[in-house]
Curated annotation (Swiss-Prot):
InterPro entries: SfsA, SfsA_C, SfsA_N. Signal peptide: none annotated. Belongs to the SfsA family. GO terms for molecular function: DNA binding. Pfam families: SfsA, SfsA_N. HAMAP family: SfsA. This is Sugar fermentation stimulation protein homolog. Disulfide bonds: none annotated.
Length: 258
């Protein structure tokens, strides 16, 4: 098992292993409701209802059905206002999705460092959360032996609507569109730029921009791909102990209608 150490541009050094494990054994529960974006009421197996932190600012479309099975982590830190964090949800009574948006960047960093992502092999230097563009941070900045840089923006995909096809975004995102144009700018400056869809839903077999949800994002996606921004997607294997990036899945270009 190889462990890489990265100097993360202002962050503490982080240790990555081939598998991202949850910090504590997860606790199964039942979702009562999500509210105020960051809060959720969860019923535990003993019947107690706890308020858990929901680490996801998105709409979580199809991933927050009342009554769904969910899995929580519990912190022993007495300074935390909420001891529980919502990590996973069962979708359509058969798939698992990771709703904690703090994990995709870690998963992708682990996959790159361990050679799982063949498209991003042979970049000996990796830095996380590096400032670039207009008041933005790139998720991963890779540097090759020749000094050429590769900018990698990571997006988590959890919206499944039909036949294994996953959609991003699950709500209108001006910020996401801005990230696309910033990647295109890096290409114009002579660098490599990659949009990396981290498929955090076990039922998703391919990914496409959600033109029916955010047409402007889909239009920008098509535009920047024509300018040289690369797009790749990898699926994550998920269970209640750990997660890991396992395989490449196709990216389908959107159909844009007037």
């Amino acid at each position: 098992m190889r462990v890489a150490v990265f100097d993360c541009d202002g962050f503490h050094k982080k240790f990555w292993s081939p598998v991202v494990k949850f910090p504590t054994p997860l606790i199964e529960g039942k979702l009562i409701k999500r509210y105020k974006r960051f809060l959720s009421d969860i019923e535990l197996p003993n019947g107690d209802v706890v308020v858990a932190h929901c680490p996801n600012t998105g709409s979580m479309k199809r991933c927050q059905q009342d009554g769904a099975r969910v899995w929580l982590s519990k912190s022993d830190n007495p300074k935390r206002k909420l001891a529980y964090t919502w990590e996973l949800v069962e979708v359509d009574a058969q798939y698992l999705a990771c709703i904690n948006t703090g994990y995709p960047n870690k998963l992708v960093g682990e996959a790159i460092s361990n050679g799982v992502v063949k498209e991003l092999a042979e970049y000996p230097e990796q830095k996380a959360e590096v400032k670039y563009g207009e008041k933005s941070r790139i998720d991963w900045l890779l540097t090759g032996n020749d000094g050429r840089k590769c900018y990698v923006e990571v997006k988590s995909v959890t919206l499944l609507e039909e036949d294994g096809l996953g959609y991003f975004p699950d709500a209108v995102t001006d910020r996401g569109r801005k990230h696309l144009y910033e990647l295109a700018k890096m290409v114009e400056e002579g660098h490599r730029a990659v949009m990396f869809f981290c498929v955090s839903h076990t039922g998703i077999n391919s990914v496409t921009p959600a033109a029916h949800i955010d047409k402007k994002y889909a239009q920008a996606f098509v535009e920047v791909v024509k300018k040289g921004v690369e797009v790749i997607a990898y699926q994550v294997a998920i269970d209640s102990q750990e997660m890991k990036v396992v395989r490449s899945v196709p990216v389908v270009m959107p159909t844009l209608l007037d």
